[in-house]
């Protein structure tokens, strides 16, 4: 182990537990001392203020995170987050996935796609009392009242089409917050390196370390000439954000405090052990089996047809990522006995509960009954749900549901089918063409139907509609007939169905429309049963969470909500880790590692211009002499250090930190202690995958693209001089 890191390692071991938490911004003042311990000097009150720097420069993509980095609406995120935008503009004659893309001027920036959005969170308001006031004890009525109260709040919040508001549940329904976001509807592609840079190492390196991935890309936000959000138009102008991030060209060193801000998707840290067992024993293995079959199928078909390979590139990347995460979760459950750890903590909670007789002693028992029912319902519906996986059937189901919902007043409609939702509804129908191929869709659907036929939970409506009980039925021929007779493969026809009434649907001869009509009552009955169960859980889960929070506080453990796709902040330090016996992983990787991994074949096929820049040592002022702390600093007055920090003499490519992240944090800006951009979050280590269920500070590490690699790529490899000029570059 490097002597230069001894001090850092000692420091880490002392306060590692402090790094846990995906905190709501308003909570930051309560952990100000923790931030200070990490060397994060930006005032905690500033991080709680969504209207000022740096928080108002952090934006959501709906599935990833990004940030403004110029006064002209330039946005930086991960390459894999911009993947569908790159794919949308990729054709066989100009394959931007393979070749990369750089717009040398704003007039050359193409649309990222009809349903790409940027969301800027402007306000987060506690509306718990408004959502939960005077709720019925009847489960279905209770569920509907929560929904209706939420819809009323959303309607009052969305003062015009420029804003998107949502009510989100926190702590499993114990709290509710109204999220108000400015929505940018014209997003354009600006710059993306080739996939052989942005995804260097591919699925082999995914969730692994050391990494050498240039997982970055640039988009731009556009608005109408009046400065307000507008749909795509050629004469739209760049959006001028209220703030944009300072970019620190000197980056960070080992031991430096860092924090990330972003939109983490889902974690399950407060869930019961029985839920973890269900995921481990049935859900994850079942999902992994299906993903693997789909990946193998699309990969084989893509090798025969370049159009398929391009259209399904985004889906393949997403499925491969999910597949590796599932396998990592399953391996991690066995390697670290997380089930045992969770059960032990649950047992301790029950013991504490007995010492607090004023609290409901049956909290877990009551919740377990409902969870068992929920798992049974999920299992029984799983194969029927997948049996409707055809893209065209999914569209038909949604379109018929829209016609049904339009029979109600807008306030009574389900979320997703209100007037506020129709623009995005239309965009999704348009976007189908960019990631759809009849042969692939039909093959995947046939696989799901065969899996459905092989299990006992059969649905009469589906069996009758497709004649599945008839042993003489040739499933392949049956599906060929459906696809050959439908008009839903045509975008104009799909969009026209948005204006059709229920009678038009019910008298249609289109086979997918007819199938959607036939399945509607069954789908609605299942949805109603799920709502009733959700209504029951909306009482049991908050009661459980209230007691758990009290228990956590009694133990002086961090209390923060599970991730739910809303804006959060996590902090930590730049740090390596002991991945297994005698194997310590250093916090930084170098350009040399790209060359060492290069084979010329995917996924280690670095572009020649990148290899040339490395071999010719065209580093410029991006060369970093050392990524370790100066031994003359205070830390080395306490510990024995080398006379000089160990030499690095390269450009840092990726680095590790102990920040707490999960899916959705991809693209999150990584800040130094001053609140300046020093990298982008893009992955986690394989050992850390199980952090969605249980946070282990010893091995939990996030993987980031170093800003110095991004700037070097822009400067010395791709010559994105026009973009470099836009950035507000600072140095230490």
From Swiss-Prot:
According to its UniProt entry, one GO biological process term is: proteolysis
Q: What class of enzyme is it?
A: hydrolase
Q: Name the EC number(s).
A: 3.4.14.-
Give GO MF terms, alphabetically: dipeptidyl-peptidase activity; serine-type aminopeptidase activity
Q: Which UniProt keywords apply?
A: Aminopeptidase, Hydrolase, Protease, Serine protease, Signal
Name the domain of life. Answer: Bacteria
Q: Identify the catalytic residues.
A: 80, 215, 666
**Signal sequence annotation:** 1-18
One Pfam entry for this protein is Peptidase_S46
Q: Which family does it belong to?
A: Belongs to the peptidase S46 family.
Cited function: Catalyzes the removal of dipeptides from the N-terminus of oligopeptides. Shows a strict specificity for acidic residues (Asp or Glu) in the P1 position, and has probably a hydrophobic residue preference at the P2 position. Preferentially cleaves the synthetic substrate Leu-Glu-methylcoumaryl-7-amide (Leu-Glu-MCA) as compared to Leu-Asp-MCA.
Its protein name is: Asp/Glu-specific dipeptidyl-peptidase
Organism of provenance: Shewanella putrefaciens (strain CN-32 / ATCC BAA-453)
